[in-house]
UniProtKB/Swiss-Prot annotation:
Cysteines engaged in disulfide bonds, as pairs: none
Name of the gene encoding the protein in the UniProt record: rpsO
Listed Pfam families: Ribosomal_S15 (PF00312)
Assigned GO CC terms: cytosolic small ribosomal subunit
Protein name: Small ribosomal subunit protein uS15
Molecular function per GO: rRNA binding; structural constituent of ribosome
Any GO BP annotation: translation
SMART domains recorded: Ribosomal_S15
Alphabetic keyword roster: Ribonucleoprotein, Ribosomal protein, RNA-binding, rRNA-binding
Keyword rRNA-binding assigned: yes
Function summary: One of the primary rRNA binding proteins, it binds directly to 16S rRNA where it helps nucleate assembly of the platform of the 30S subunit by binding and bridging several RNA helices of the 16S rRNA. Forms an intersubunit bridge (bridge B4) with the 23S rRNA of the 50S subunit in the ribosome.
The keyword Chloroplast is annotated on this UniProt entry: no
Signal peptide: none
Length: 89
């Protein structure tokens, strides 16, 4: 469920805007999406793990807020991010 350091570094490198960017909305959404996908796989194996399900819902809400912020600030970056991550919005 937690991302390994090399996985996290690879995601940051793929979505960063400049060389020292680690906190832009694009990077945050990409990291959250990876964590969400990991939790979804965990819940397929352990469907009664309600604590993890609550954590998943919190992560989805945080990602939704970040995507709404990005959509209001930069539509082109929003659309590019949605396409690259394969999200349905």
């Amino acid at each position: 469920m937690a991302l390994e350091k090399d996985e996290k570094t690879a995601i940051i490198t793929d979505y960063q805007i400049h060389s020292s960017d680690t906190g832009s909305p694009q990077v945050q959404v990409a990291l959250l999406t990876e964590r969400i996908n990991g939790l979804i796989e965990h819940l397929k194996v352990h469907p009664h793990d309600h604590h993890s399900r609550r954590g998943l819902l919190k992560l989805v809400g945080r990602r939704r807020r970040l995507l709404a912020y990005l959509a209001s600030k930069d539509k082109d970056a929003y659309r590019k991010l949605i396409d690259s991550l394969g999200l349905r919005r």
